[in-house]
Design a protein with these regions (language model features):
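Structural beta-alpha unit
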Residues: 1-5, 80-115, 152-153
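Short, structured motif recognition centered on aromatic/hydrophobic residues
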Residues: 11-12, 30, 38-40, 74-75, ...
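Glycine-rich, Arg-bearing micro-motifs that act as flexible, cationic patches
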Residues: 114-136
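Short, hinge-like loop/turn segments at secondary-structure boundaries
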Residues: 55-59, 108-110, 133-134
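A short acidic, glycine-rich active-site loop
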Residues: 58-73
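Short, well-ordered secondary-structure micro-motifs
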Residues: 23, 50-53, 101-104, 127-129
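Small/aliphatic-rich secondary-structure junction motif
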Residues: 2-58, 81-83, 87-90, 140, ...
């Protein structure tokens, strides 16, 4: 059994799908046991830079801002639910291209102690054995990674 307090900062990665949310109860239990901070991490992937000018010209910038605001509200809603359970929770929203790379950079830069993520997400199967985000994160971070399958939730 792990010593209490081993994990101080725990990240759960979310992509807005119900699949990714299935990792939350596992992360919350570990955070509660360790009295750790739980960080809800979402990477927002904007349109590719080569299309950004076209999007702005087409008047889509407002729609992108609305989408970003919806994501923020989604994360804040989850944070508030978890705070109601007496957990120390914060939200981290990163904007950029290269989801796995951005997740790894954040985890390594912030000295995260544990990563909890689902093997399924918005793209369907995470292709764990074939180079999906979960595998890239496992290979790119120093922290242990707990993978949650949908049927484990």
């Amino acid at each position: 059994m792990a010593e209490q307090g081993r994990y101080k900062k725990i990240v759960v990665t979310l992509d807005g799908s119900g699949w990714s949310e299935r990792a939350i109860p596992h992360a919350a239990d570990i955070a509660r046991y360790n009295n750790a901070e739980l960080i809800l991490l979402h990477v927002f992937r904007p349109p590719a830079h080569e299309f950004a000018d076209q999007v702005a010209l087409a008047g889509q910038e407002d729609q992108l801002n609305q989408l970003l605001e919806q994501i923020k509200q989604y994360l804040i809603g989850l944070r508030n639910q978890l705070r109601d359970e007496q957990l120390n929770v914060r939200v981290q929203l990163i904007e950029g291209i290269g989801v796995a790379h951005l997740i790894c950079d954040y985890i390594n830069d912030q000295d995260i102690d544990l990563v909890v993520m689902s093997t399924h997400g918005r793209t369907g199967l995470a292709r764990f054995l074939f180079g999906g985000v979960a595998q890239k994160v496992m290979q790119g971070v120093r922290a242990p990674v707990l993978l949650v399958r949908p049927d484990d939730a």
